Amino acid sequence: MGAERLKVIIVGGSIAGLTLAHCLDKAGIDYVVLEKRKEITHQEGASILILPHGGRILDQLGMFHSLSQYTEPLHAAHISYPDGFTHTNRSPQVLTDRFGIPLILVERRNLLKVLYNSLPDQSLVQLGKKVVSLNHHNGQVTVTVDDGNVYEGDLVVGADGVHSRVRDEVWRLSDAIRSGTVKDKEKKSMSIEYACIFGISNGVSGLVAGEQVASLNKGRSFLTFPGRDGRVFWFLMHKLDKNYTYPGAPRWSPEDAERIAARYIDDHIWNGVQFKDIWDKREVCGITNLEENIFQTWHSGRVLCLGDSMHKMAPNTGQGANCAMEDAALLANYLRHYLDGQKTAAKPSQEDLNTLFEKFSRDRINRLQSIYKMSRIVVRLHAGRNLFLRLMGRYYLPNTGDVPANQASKSIASGIYLDYLPLPTYSAPGWQDFAPNSKLFSGSLLLIMSVALLFGVICWAGRDIHPLSMKILALLGNYVSQ
């Protein structure tokens, strides 16, 4: 690769940013990470679900097993409904058996701790560096931070989250080249319909480690993940009074979280456990808006954004962090391919980076569309947003067998991995059986939902006098998912 190595400036010590640092290190590409906070592992009470495609990337980087000390693998999924009906499925265990990697829930700070502590050179992560501006200069890009220091590199990657400063700079740089390049419609395309209170509690009896619970209700839902040592990770998704446009959503305080929680304090979670039992034993909690969007403009010049800065979805499907890690892996793949294909040590021109960035963003948008749509459906289904989704949640989901696992398997098997590192060997068939070119990959989400609506109405109209309809619904649901 020559004496002068490519240098990447990563803005944001996030999951995406630190994963990218590892990927670049393995690819032999220089980097520096600029993080505005004074510490990497700030305690927020947030937790992250690692699905097999995200776990595979972490495994390639040698970190997945380091997370096991913090986690209890998921093996069962319960659903409870406001009418008292409950349902249990084995989707987490099915996915583990199919892909050879357990589904694990880990505190966000512990994942960041593992990512940070396992870096070969932690001095390359610069803390307390808030970005002020980005500028192009003589085939390089410079980043100025609030303490006056200036960093120079060949490209900048914004991994600085949903409130991204780098995204603002991408828009500014694009408009400086040609006014109106980024339309106001795109700048206002991120919406907020739900807020989330999240936290960690301890000593809650009645919940079993490794058995997740989705508690559905009208206008809100709970996701509960009992973990190791009596700890419980939980989320309360709450529908707002209207659909807001970013950044115009309400700002929340701890008092707001207490006020909202009090409204649902008697809601049933599972096995006699009420939300009160979890809330009263909270160790830490927070509240945040659930932004939703996939932006279309990911780059300008030598600057590219990824992770939550470009795609943000509700936590109900657990895909957010996994998709961010995929972003990091794919970008590292493309940069490595570029360098391997060069006959000289010349660094990438602006035209080279435009081509690479455009391919990267198109490939990621294409991959993310179905994942994003599913996350939008699931958060609204869990909160019973309309009659169709309430029918689907109550009468279709409990009778679908492995349909949810099959849908998840398709997105998992299509996941990105680091193509310049060895793939872990798993004696599990799911990676091949649910690959995009396999027979099991075919099937239409729209068709599934249409069948769900038709037979949900039949079941709802007759309530308990149509058990045959429910069986037919389950059979058709399994059929159309294949």
UniProtKB/Swiss-Prot annotation:
Membrane topology recorded in Swiss-Prot or TrEMBL: Single-pass membrane protein
Residues reported to bind FAD: 35, 108, 308, 321
Glycosylation sites: 243
Keyword vocabulary terms for this entry: FAD, Flavoprotein, Glycoprotein, Membrane, Monooxygenase, Oxidoreductase, Signal, Transmembrane, Transmembrane helix
Entry-linked InterPro entries: FAD-bd, FAD/NAD-bd_sf, FAD_mOase_fung
Main location: membrane
Segments crossing the lipid bilayer: 440-460
Cofactors required: FAD
Subcellular location field: Membrane
Gene Ontology MF term list: FAD binding; monooxygenase activity
E.C. numbers: 1.-.-.-
Pathway: Secondary metabolite biosynthesis; terpenoid biosynthesis
Top-level taxon of origin: Eukaryota
Pfam families: FAD_binding_3 (PF01494)
Top EC class, one word: oxidoreductase
Biotechnology: Shearone derivatives produced by this cluster are interesting candidates for Alzheimer's disease (AD) therapy since they moderately inhibit aggregation of amyloid beta 42 (Abeta42).
Any one Gene Ontology cellular component term annotated for this protein: membrane
Signal peptide: 1-21
Described function: FAD-dependent monooxygenase; part of the cluster that mediates the biosynthesis of shearones, diterpenoid pyrones (DPs) which are structurally diverse meroterpenoids consisting of a diterpene linked by a pyrone, and which may exhibit a range of bioactivities. Within the pathway, esdpE takes part to the biosynthesis of the molecular scaffold by catalyzing the formation of an (S)-epoxide ring at the terminal olefin of the geranylgeranyl group.
Entry's family note: Belongs to the paxM FAD-dependent monooxygenase family.
Protein name from the UniProt record: FAD-dependent monooxygenase esdpE
Species in which this protein is naturally found: Penicillium shearii (Eupenicillium shearii)
